[in-house]
């Protein structure tokens, strides 16, 4: 009876699939993105948040958002806190600007609410279409460089230098050697298309470090989930409404939008969901899952939730319905009971995940039109300044300002949508406000 309902609700027959295929696809998708359970708490705890609470928030927010995607939008797409935005949350906003993590969570919440409003009014897709590709792809590449740099820094491969700002670290340090090993191992696994390559890299590197005595073994395998109280409903929304934080809210919003719509398009194309006009049916429902995840995540205690391109692994295995997402969500909830293992994973083991994910994000560079300097230069400024300033907001701001200036002074001002001019003024005023 239940199986009949499941098959009918998820339209197994229509998509030519079955319970076994959908379940295996869900397990595969989870394996490819489970690294976020280890990486996200490590990144956000650096901002002063409780490690255990963030781990719980990560699993629950991912499960809820993915369930909404599976049951409401009925697509095999999984969601979790976005890589890049979590790094920006910690290093760009909290540590870089000295903003309390509660206020930063408030900014994430506001961006999520904005996301919901614009999704309901269908304005979100319109905004995405009028933003220049140079800014979209420049941002993606810049975030890739940003998180890769953080990975190299946390591994001790790159260290600070008074003479040159940064320099090569001591590669003979045991933890640094292990991080290098992890990067090479994960690179090989990714290149060979091994399912769960990043997760395997983290686990193997950690085990070697534990065996060599560089880091301690976990105190156990299973336990009850830690308390979420230290981060649950701790966000400071009023503090985030400060005018000076407007560009941070916009940064969270735009990056989530670029990431989600770009990922949805790629996954929908791979799965054969696009209609004859190249549009994704029920796209608003899919976007709502993403927006809901961000709002719920901020309430629980984690940074922006977004759709994961790793969902492609489950689709490649034959997953075609929302049941895949249901399986992924259940596995995220099951992960709550593996806290001792998550807590024992050392930073040098997760460094490889940051570097490899950063490398994978570089693929967007091929979409930048380097033959047109009015497109190439704004994209270059965006992708360069994000890692160098440790701020996605600053990179976005400089990109939005540079783009219309070059178009105007080359007589091509009509190519720029009026919204881009408005955003350029807002971002320019941001610099005036900060300098004042």
Curated annotation (Swiss-Prot):
It is found in: Cell membrane. Its main location: membrane. Pfam families: Xan_ur_permease. It is a multi-pass membrane protein. GO terms for cellular component: plasma membrane. The chain crosses the membrane at residues 24-44, 51-71, 79-99, 103-123, 139-159, 171-191, 194-214, 235-255, 322-342, 345-365, 381-401, 416-436. The keyword Iron-sulfur does not apply. The keyword Plastid does not apply. Keywords: Cell membrane, Membrane, Transmembrane, Transmembrane helix, Transport. One of its GO terms (molecular function) is purine nucleobase transmembrane transporter activity. It comes from the Archaea. PANTHER family: XANTHINE/URACIL PERMEASE C887.17-RELATED, XANTHINE_URACIL PERMEASE C887.17-RELATED. Belongs to the nucleobase:cation symporter-2 (NCS2) (TC 2.A.40) family. Azg-like subfamily. This is Putative permease MJ0326. It comes from Methanocaldococcus jannaschii (strain ATCC 43067 / DSM 2661 / JAL-1 / JCM 10045 / NBRC 100440).
């Amino acid at each position: 009876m239940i199986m009949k309902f499941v098959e009918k609700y998820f339209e197994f027959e229509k998509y030519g699939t079955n319970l076994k295929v959908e379940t295996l696809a869900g397990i595969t998708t989870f394996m490819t993105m489970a690294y976020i359970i280890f990486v996200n708490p490590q990144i956000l705890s650096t901002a002063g948040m409780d490690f255990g609470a963030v781990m719980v928030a990560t699993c629950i927010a991912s499960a809820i958002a993915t369930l909404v995607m599976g049951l409401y939008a009925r697509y095999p797409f999984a969601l979790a806190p976005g890589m890049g935005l979590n790094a920006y949350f910690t290093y760009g906003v909290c540590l870089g600007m000295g903003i309390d993590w509660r206020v930063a969570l408030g900014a994430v919440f506001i961006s999520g609410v904005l996301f919901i409003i614009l999704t309901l009014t269908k304005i979100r897709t319109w905004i995405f279409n009028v933003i220049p590709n140079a800014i979209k792809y420049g941002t993606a590449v810049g975030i890739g460089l940003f998180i890769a740099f953080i990975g190299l820094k946390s591994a001790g491969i790159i260290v600070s230098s008074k003479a040159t700002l940064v320099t090569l670290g001591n590669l003979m340090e045991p933890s640094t050697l292990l991080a290098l090993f992890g990067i090479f191992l994960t690179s090989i696994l990714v290149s060979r298309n091994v399912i769960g390559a990043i997760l395997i890299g983290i686990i193997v590197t950690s085990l070697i470090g534990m065996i060599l005595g560089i880091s301690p073994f976990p105190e156990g395998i299973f336990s009850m989930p830690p308390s979420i109280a230290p981060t649950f409903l701790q966000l400071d929304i009023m503090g985030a409404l400060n005018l000076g934080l407007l560009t941070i809210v916009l940064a969270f919003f735009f990056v989530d939008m670029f990431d989600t719509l770009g990922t949805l398009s790629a996954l929908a194309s791979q799965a054969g969901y696009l209609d004859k006009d190249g549009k994704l049916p029920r796209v608003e429902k899919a976007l709502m899952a993403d927006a809901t995840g961000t709002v719920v995540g901020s309430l629980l205690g984690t940074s922006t939730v977004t759709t994961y391109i790793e969902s492609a692994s489950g689709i490649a295995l034959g997953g075609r319905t929302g049941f895949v997402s249901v399986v992924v969500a259940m596995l995220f909830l099951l992960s709550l009971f593996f806290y001792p293992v998550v807590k024992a994973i050392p930073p040098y083991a997760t460094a490889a995940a940051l570097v490899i994910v950063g490398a994978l994000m570089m693929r967007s560079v091929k979409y930048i039109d380097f033959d047109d300097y009015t497109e190439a230069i704004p994209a270059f400024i965006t992708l360069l300044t994000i890692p160098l300033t440790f701020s996605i907001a600053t990179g976005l701001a400089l990109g939005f300002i540079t783009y219309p200036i070059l178009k105007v002074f080359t007589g091509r001002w009509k190519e720029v949508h009026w919204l881009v001019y408005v955003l350029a003024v807002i971002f320019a005023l941001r610099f005036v406000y900060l300098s004042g």
